[in-house]
Amino acid sequence: MATYALQMAALVLGGVGMVGTVAVTIMPQWRVSAFIESNIVVFENRWEGLWMNCMRHANIRMQCKVYDSLLALSPDLQASRGLMCAASVLAFLAFMTAILGMKCTRCTGDDENVKSRILLTAGIIFFITGLVVLIPVSWVANSIIRDFYNPLVDVALKRELGEALYIGWTTALVLIAGGALFCCVFCCTERSNSYRYSVPSHRTTQRSFHAEKRSPSIYSKSQYV
């Protein structure tokens, strides 16, 4: 029962991580306008994401435009686009693999050893996905902070950390936690199986020992008669 609860908790974390990965990939709030020094133009707000940039003026609806070319992106955003797409695919693959290894799933049979190995595979993929999400989010955040404190960068070009980065860090931790729980499920299953097989063998050894101990006395009585 405890193992099944761990499976469900890990699956929920994996599902949340998968949704978060897709959300971070499509969100435009990776870089947002920084209102500092002479750039205190609060009626204009700019967002920059992996696929589009958005601008909102005072009393005007937010307007977004898809990038015309991949080369229009900075190197960190170009790499982040590829890594986040790969992370989305990995998260979906890990989630579907985890469903196949769940205790309530019947299409993969009832063998606990097979299912535990499937869950271990899903856990490893979830863990790798968390690292893949963590790399681009931290990379972009580092470039934003570096440019923010660089005196050679114009104030109008400086940006702040957007909401997508914070969600990305949270998503990476959730994915890693889900993968760790699936690995714990595998360890618990292997431990219970080893205990289950070790107890009968121990009892069999005791029985054979008692049988050997009784046999000489029986033989001696028959020989005496």
From Swiss-Prot:
The gene is Cldn8. Ubiquitinated by the BCR(KLHL3) E3 ubiquitin ligase complex in the kidney, leading to its degradation. Residues 29-81, 139-166 are extracellular. InterPro entries: Claudin, Claudin_CS, PMP22/EMP/MP20/Claudin. Residues 1-7, 103-117, 188-225 are cytoplasmic. It catalyses: chloride(in) = chloride(out); bromide(in) = bromide(out); iodide(out) = iodide(in); fluoride(in) = fluoride(out). It comes from the Eukaryota. Belongs to the claudin family. Keywords: Cell junction, Cell membrane, Isopeptide bond, Membrane, Tight junction, Transmembrane, Transmembrane helix, Ubl conjugation. GO terms for biological process: calcium-independent cell-cell adhesion via plasma membrane cell-adhesion molecules. This is Claudin-8. Can associate with other claudins to regulate tight junction structural and functional strand dynamics. May coassemble with CLDN4 into tight junction strands containing anion-selective channels that convey paracellular chloride permeability in renal collecting ducts. Cannot form tight junction strands on its own. It is found in: Cell junction, Tight junction; Cell membrane. Residues 224-225 are annotated as: Interactions with TJP1, TJP2 and TJP3. The chain crosses the membrane at residues 8-28, 82-102, 118-138, 167-187.
